[in-house]
A protein has these predicted regions:
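N-terminal beta-loop-helix "entrance" segment that forms/cooperates
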Residues: 32-43, 54-58
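Histidine-anchored nucleotide/phosphate-binding helix
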Residues: 8-26, 32
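C-terminal structural segments of small proteins and small subunits
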Residues: 59-86
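Extreme N-terminal starter segment of soluble prokaryotic enzymes
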Residues: 1-3
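Short, hinge-like loop/turn segments at secondary-structure boundaries
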Residues: 42-45, 63-64
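Flexible, charged surface loops at secondary-structure boundaries
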Residues: 18-22, 39-42, 74-79
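Short internal beta-strands
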Residues: 24-31, 44-51
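A short, acidic, amphipathic alpha-helical segment used as a generic capping/interface helix at domain edges
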Residues: 12-13, 33-35, 69-72
Length: 86
């Protein structure tokens, strides 16, 4: 299983790679939070609570995107192979 870290810069490329990995987990960071949720349909997606709050997206971001703390993100990333598309 791999963790794909994505911002908006290389989002399309990152998603295409993640879709080839049936066990992929995605962590959206920075402006990646503005991506259309439909792009991640059927995928496990996380976002940092602090980044969601900073951008005022608490009410907008779908509940299918799991909110995590930075500490939880570190735990996820240390347990899996990390691929960055930032």
């Amino acid at each position: 299983m791999s963790i794909y870290i994505m911002d908006k810069t290389n989002l399309e490329t990152g998603i295409s790679y993640a879709k080839m990995d049936e066990n992929a987990k995605i962590i959206l960071i920075q402006d990646g939070l503005y991506a259309s949720p439909e792009l991640f349909e059927g995928m496990k997606v996380f976002a940092f609570t602090d980044e969601i709050t900073e951008r005022g997206l608490e009410e907008i971001l779908p509940q299918s995107i799991e909110r995590i703390t930075y500490d939880e993100g570190i735990d996820i990333m240390t347990d899996e192979k990390v691929i960055s598309f930032c």
